[in-house]
From Swiss-Prot:
MF GO annotations: structural constituent of ribosome
Keywords: Ribonucleoprotein, Ribosomal protein
Superkingdom of origin organism: Bacteria
Keyword match Ribosomal protein: yes
Family from the record: Belongs to the universal ribosomal protein uL29 family.
Organism, as annotated: Streptomyces coelicolor (strain ATCC BAA-471 / A3(2) / M145)
GO BP terms: translation
GO cellular component: cytosolic large ribosomal subunit
Gene symbol of the encoding locus: rpmC
Stated name of the protein: Large ribosomal subunit protein uL29
Length: 74
């Protein structure tokens, strides 16, 4: 993911792609936390950006679950 994924970009993705993005973001967050703990992290703002990306993905998934947002078929 880039410096921060926009919600509009995430809305264009299907459910499977969203789950893949979520897995990637969680893995990146784990790696960033590990780097921070060992003193190797240079960009601390990236932690915040990845956490927000994860929150955006969870929000979008919940909207779809409740029927607020529908999956657009391409």
């Amino acid at each position: 993911m880039s410096a921060g994924t926009k919600a509009s970009e995430l809305r264009e993705l299907g459910n499977e792609e969203l789950l893949a993005k979520l897995r990637e973001a969680k893995e990146e967050l784990f790696n960033l936390r590990f780097q921070a703990a060992t003193g190797q992290l240079e960009n601390h703002g990236r932690l915040k950006a990845v956490r927000k990306d994860i929150a955006r993905i969870y929000t979008l998934m919940r909207e779809r679950e409740l029927g607020i947002e529908t999956v657009e078929s391409a």
